[in-house]
């Protein structure tokens, strides 16, 4: 087990040194304006990422537009390929497929992969075909059921850790072989 603690700047330098490309994302296109899309958009906007959300439900578009005034809300069917291209799919730095239909998310990601060099994120609800999906190169696959598990693990670890309230996020990367914790160290914390 290896533990690596660093400031954001030093972490970036470390990843460059080991030749692990880490490009900050400046813009993202999200197809699907549900709860995950909403919260992801909030996080991205807080990190100064330009966000475009494609959502087909007009009522949901209104809610998103009111709740996320900094985001661009596009009320359109996200599976409309010509629309995605006309809205700059080819130049997007991150494409995130978050509809409620797994098959649609897979096809959208494969389409985005063909037309964009951006980072890809695909939401999959059903776990039964994860071995097949792993061979499709869909970028980062997000399983909401696993995310729930990760939040529970994060909470339990926080309870076990006296500085637990400082833990912000638990990440699992490289096929769950690596765990990364993001936490806040306050100025008055003991060194």
Q: How would you describe each model-predicted region?
A:
Residues 1-191:
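Cytosolic regulatory regions of ion transport systems
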């Amino acid at each position: 087990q290896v533990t690596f603690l660093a400031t954001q700047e030093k972490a970036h330098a470390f990843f460059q040194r080991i030749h692990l490309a880490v490009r900050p994302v400046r813009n993202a296109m999200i197809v699907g304006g549900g709860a995950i899309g909403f919260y992801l958009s909030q996080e991205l906007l807080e990190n100064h990422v330009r966000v475009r959300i494609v959502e087909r439900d007009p009522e949901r578009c209104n809610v998103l537009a009111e709740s996320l005034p900094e985001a661009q809300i596009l009320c359109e069917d996200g599976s409309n390929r010509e629309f995605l291209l006309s809205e700059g799919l080819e130049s997007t730095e991150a494409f995130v497929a978050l509809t409620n239909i797994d098959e649609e998310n897979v096809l959208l990601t494969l389409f985005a992969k063909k037309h964009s060099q951006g980072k890809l994120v695909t939401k999959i609800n059903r776990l039964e075909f994860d071995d097949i999906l792993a061979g499709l190169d869909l970028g980062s696959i997000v399983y909401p059921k696993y995310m729930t598990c990760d939040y529970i693990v994060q909470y339990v670890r926080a309870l076990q850790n006296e500085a637990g309230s400082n833990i912000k996020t638990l990440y699992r990367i490289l096929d769950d072989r690596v765990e990364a914790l993001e936490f806040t160290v306050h100025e008055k914390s003991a060194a």
